[in-house]
Amino acid sequence: YWMASEDHDFEEIQSFLFKGKKIQWNSEQEGRAVGTIQLDDLDPVLDLFEQHLGSKPSAETLKKWIAISYRNSSNLAEATRKFVHFLFQDYSLVVVDANDFNLKKLFVPAMAMELKNQKCFESVATQTQNIKKTYNEKFVPQVNPRPINLFYLTSKDRYLIRKEENHYYLEDSDKKLSEKEMLNELEEHPERFSPNVLMRPLYQETILPNVGYIGGGGELAYWFQLNHFFEMHNIPFPILVLRNSALLLSEKTAQKLNRLDISTKDCFLPRVNLINKKIRQISNIDLDLGFLKKQLEKQFGYLEGLVAQTDPSFEGALKAQLAKQNKGIEALEKRLLQAQKRKLKDQVQRMTDLHKEIFPNDALQERQLNVVEFYLDHGGEFINALMKVLDPFSNEFSVIKY
């Protein structure tokens, strides 16, 4: 497990949803590498969270590990490592915190090349053009490279590095170093340098080479920009694997789907489309007026023949009239459907509620629900069950009933 402890986007991790309620950690430590954030001001958030956990045995286990992880760690990286170990303690999971002097030492040659020659910018720009030329000229890169794709870290902040002529500047500070001073700083204190989002993959594969890299769609999008950069550094580029996605359906939810005769495939339709489809299926009248359009086409086909024999200038008016009649039929069809939905409002409401249950806030569960909600109900067996059924090399969206 690669712990992104050098990421700076605190906003992305400072809150989570639990049973529909937002729990947020407000801290003044923003702007620094998130792994180094201290936990002194986290206790009120943990107290609030634990109030919602209840008193089940699984809840007491969670409280114990929250205390071990988040109440007894010096920073967020240490706490995260402990909690991930708790979740996957039976699976020999390797946790890598790359914000480390010895690991950074291995990456000094690549960082020195970046400082001196700015090769990341050049190679990523070249690869982006290759993608546009070979696959899609409208391709929009997920990430745009900077001239220097490294940050300089301090205990409280991180700074972009800018090079002008023979000197390096830390943006938003008055620090200025010559090339020799900057390279000496890198050699003596590699832990003070941090790769940005484009150089981080190279760092990752330098210290822990992988046959494959598993990531989300957004992550893979910028990895596609990097194979030329990897070649430049003689680092093997891994096979890119899209991570699993799954929908978890409880037995109760599955029964609701069966009662409404909704397939799991139809669950993924937009809510309006799903409801319209089911209303058409369960109605005792045919709401499809497509047959009227076909009749119109036949009748106007006859008129087209007359126009061709008399005055072809009427052809435009004829086509306009056909379009007008078709729009009228479509409007009538929509009104019939709306009337039927009002008549079957109980079924519409049940389908609406069920769809909201499956896709909270109109989003995938993985974007809204917290793993703790499932752990409370099933304990550690929840993780074990997922490990058994998820196939990392399946190219399908999994629907798991539990």
Predicted regions located by residue number:
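A translation/RNA-centric and nucleic-acid-associated enzymatic feature enriched
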Residues: 141-211, 217-228, 237-239, 244-252, ...
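Residues forming anionic-ligand binding surfaces in small-molecule and nucleic-acid pockets
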Residues: 46-69
